[in-house]
Amino acid sequence: MSGIIIKERMFGKETAMEKVYIAIDLKSFYASVECVERGLDPLDTNLVVADKSRTDKTICLAVSPSLKAYGIPGRPRLFEVVAKVDDVNSTRRMKAPRRKFRGQSNIASELNSDPSLELSYIAAPPRMALYISYSTRIYQKYIAPEDIHVYSIDEVFIDATAYLDTYGMTAHELAMTMIRDVLKNTGITATAGIGTNMYLCKIAMDIVAKHMPADKDGVRIAELDEMSYRRLMWEHQPLTDFWRVGRGYAERLRHCGLFTMGDIARFSTSEFGEKALYKMFGVNAELLIDHAWGWEPCTIADVKSYRPENSSISSGQVLQEATEWATARLITWEMADMLALDLLGKGLVTDQLTLTVGYDVKNLQIEDIRRSYEGKVVLDHYGRAVPVHAHGTINLESPVSSSKVITEAMMELFDRITDCCLLVRRITVNANRVVPESEVKEEIIQLDFFSDPEENERRRQRVQAELKREKSLQLAMLGIKEKYGKNAVLRGANLRDGATARSRNRQIGGHRA
């Protein structure tokens, strides 16, 4: 695909595609890393990455390919894995000599050759720091950091344009070289997509590669340009296979008689069709239409240089069990305190906070709560009745990163929007309208006839002095945490029953580090 230059003019839109992008998805990455760490073959070992110390409803972060072969999906709940393995073993027992197992194995090849073995699997607790370490060292041997966009721990986009001449390779050869190196040094195999823009390489990887036969090492590499995309993908269904097309989008498109990307592309050529798409999706219609035609103007350089006009920082957690209101309030306080430290560490301030509190499905299964609750009821993803979540926003007097100001405001908001009789399961805190502290303009004070300007100035100076002292303390805490670990210094509230900050400090992305 290297060297391909396609220039077209369609409906007044010219595209010059000279770039070559590679998307790489490390296959069952977390599970593969855990297998490699144990000296096991990632393609021949039954393993799930899941924290068994949580409830059996915990989500498995990864499932090894051999275990997926039994019909277990990629991101199941742990109880679903247990149930499926029990079903498989019931069938295997019927075929075993004397209908009895003589042992068990988590190795697929052994299970395939010996029907007297019971299927078992390894449940590996997640180790996010280890996965990040593997991920960061895989690609930088070949590609400079500025040409890599890390989409997730196990998936990257690479702008390979400048490297094809350097290495004297085609894009396919470069992708294969990197994947073979990964396989040789880690035992982890991969799927890759090559395209003339970031969207096409993603689709090549997500759809085309995953529907083609793998080589002897499980490697799949597919390529797309605009013309082959239209030829191969315009009739592909379902639409939800495509990047950024969720069930909601697909349902709205279906009501308009649009079932494929080809349908959307053809529909967009008429003035009526284009207006209808913009009416349905607003400004997002432009991206949908571009993708229907295989266009994507955004480059990795654009992604790296992007700075949103209105930035925000958020933190959320799903509690391990239905939690009483007072404990949820303590956890919210901890999250607000950590949010303030995060802002300070990044040199940012905020003047608006948002809180979302999700209630547990058990609420409406408890007789006393069900009788007394008079609020709105909604259905969750599984069709179960649950009280509608609480959501609210509070504005601060001025942009700050003060833990005292932020926690007090968040507690005021929590008390205002939540129902103290309900059990809580999810909490999300947001700092909105985040800006660098250096960009905050000095406040203009409006004088009036009814207040003493000198007293107001003295009050303002006292507040500023308090904020300055608190900032010094917060910076000292940050320094200790960065040097000795996040749990090296804690507040007294973090030691109370039900507090989660200490355990969260040992996690990355909500999972064990």
Region spans (language model):
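Gly/Gly-Pro- and Ser/Thr-rich, intrinsically disordered tail segments characteristic of DNA damage-repair
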Residues: S2-I300, F449, E454-A513
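DNA-contacting surface of Y-family translesion DNA polymerases
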Residues: A23, D241, R247-V424, I444
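Short, charged/polar surface micro-motifs in flexible loops or helix N-caps
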Residues: K27-F29, S53-K57, Y359-L364, V434-S438
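Generic "edge-of-domain/loop-turn" microfeature
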Residues: R54, D165, Y199, V318, ...
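Short aromatic/hydrophobic contact patches that present stacked aromatics
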Residues: F157, N395, T428
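A glycine-rich phosphate-binding loop feature that marks nucleotide/adenosyl-phosphate handling sites
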Residues: T196-Y199, D290-W293, V349-V361, L423-V435, ...
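C-terminal hydrophobic structural anchor segments
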Residues: E412, R416-G479
